Amino acid sequence: MKDKVGRIAVIGATGGIGAALSDNLMELFSSATLLAVGRSVPSREKTVGQKAPVCIGGFDLLDEESIHDTCSRIVADGMPDLVFVATGILHDGDAFPERSIKDLDRQAMEHLLAVNLVGPSLIMKHLLTHVPRKGAFRMGLLSARVGSISDNQLGGWYSYRTSKAGLNMMIKGAAIELKRRNRDAILVGLHPGTVESALSEPFQRNVPPHKLFTPEHSARCLVEVLLSRSPDQSGLCFDWAGKEIEP
């Protein structure tokens, strides 16, 4: 796969994991063209022998017109061989994950679903129709273990769990449709683990130190997982170690 990667897109390249993915992929595929997509994407310094990323700013995950326009820019010079969608939120502002169903708030829930489910689904809508009918193609979207219905033994976190469970179903359905277009294409969900960030800080207390990852470590793992998947695994969800997460 490494020798065949000429174009890469990282959507959500301004976030901690997205930025780390961009850095890792530029190092791994130094001759490839990397498209770094975000609301505002800072320029990055390139190392010797390494291309600078092509930055695509002004991306709004909550606006389908923006998603359509951005996807059109991504495929303008050819469909990428490798795509990561590194978008998503756990909480926003004062809206923390619900401990009880009594904590549900319509506005907060709709926002979380818009960011974690609707936005990534529309990215798939506007990108997957450009996948070539032959040849390798890989796409991974950030999901989460808590989106697994069978794994839910604690309850709570209603909106976040629901948004990720819905995303996993969208990935499964889109992968089935994509296989009819290109039998070698791979589309999967990826669980990055608990990553050190301002958003995860309130929930790090009970996380064992060896399971609290830096963005760089998580990114390296996710790249390895996506590159090692086979077409018969398309539509599934995997954690950072490559272990399948049951629905």
Please report, for each region that a protein language model flagged, where it lies by residue.
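N-terminal Rossmann NAD(P)H-binding glycine-rich loop of SDR-like oxidoreductase domains
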Residues: 11-27
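Conserved glycine-rich Rossmann-like NAD(P)H-binding loop of the short-chain dehydrogenase/reductase
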Residues: 26-46
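A short helix-coil junction within the Rossmann-fold of NAD(P)-dependent oxidoreductases
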Residues: 28, 78, 126-135, 181
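Rossmann-fold cofactor-recognition segment
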Residues: 49-67
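Catalytic loop of short-chain dehydrogenase/reductase
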Residues: 89-93, 97-113, 122, 133-181
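Conserved Rossmann-fold SDR core element
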Residues: 178-195, 233-234
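C-terminal helical subdomain
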Residues: 189, 202-247
